[in-house]
Amino acid sequence: MDDFAIHVAVGNVYGLIGNEANALQPKKRPLSSMAPTIVLREGRPELVVGAAGGPRIISATLQTILNVLDFHMSVSSAVEAPRIHHQWIPDRLNFEAGISPQTRKGLEERDHTLREQSALGVAQAIARQGAQLSGAADSRKFDRARTE
């Protein structure tokens, strides 16, 4: 039910403030952060990523993609890497343990308000390298798929 604004101007379980445009009504679609993503290379699927976690879905999905494509991490390392998330209100940058002290210092020097938080989204991903597929299930969630 947190995809709808049950009470206008009151935060939901994720801290998002709802308004009348997203009020609960019959035949209305809820606001959603779902972002199942397929990355193509030369028209073929290269990476598939999805996540759970309300407004943290987009951050978890994007950071997993960047970790694989830009930072050349394995799919399992990309899924397990610590994450950051900002959602406008409240005006603070949440981060997971494991973010380097240098990164934290740099963010503080740029006047970000920081707060350590656990499990900023839960991602699942499959990467293709040639004919080889590699899958990763986020250990932030206890009931996960096996990736052996």
Q: Predicted segments — roles?
A:
Residues 10, 25-30, 61, 70-118:
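Extended C-terminal subregions enriched in glycine
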Residues 1-43, 47, 71, 75:
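Active-site rim segments in enzyme catalytic domains, especially the processed small/beta chain
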Residues 48-52, 91-94:
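Second-shell loop/turn segments in exported
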Residues 1-4, 29-31, 36-45, 52-56, ...:
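Short, glycine-/Ser/Thr-/acidic-enriched flexible segments
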Residues 51-73:
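Alpha-helical support elements that line or immediately flank enzyme active sites
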Residues 98-148:
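Cofactor-centric catalytic regions
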Residues 7-9, 56-62, 144-148:
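A short, polar/proline- and glycine-enriched secondary-structure boundary/capping micro-motif
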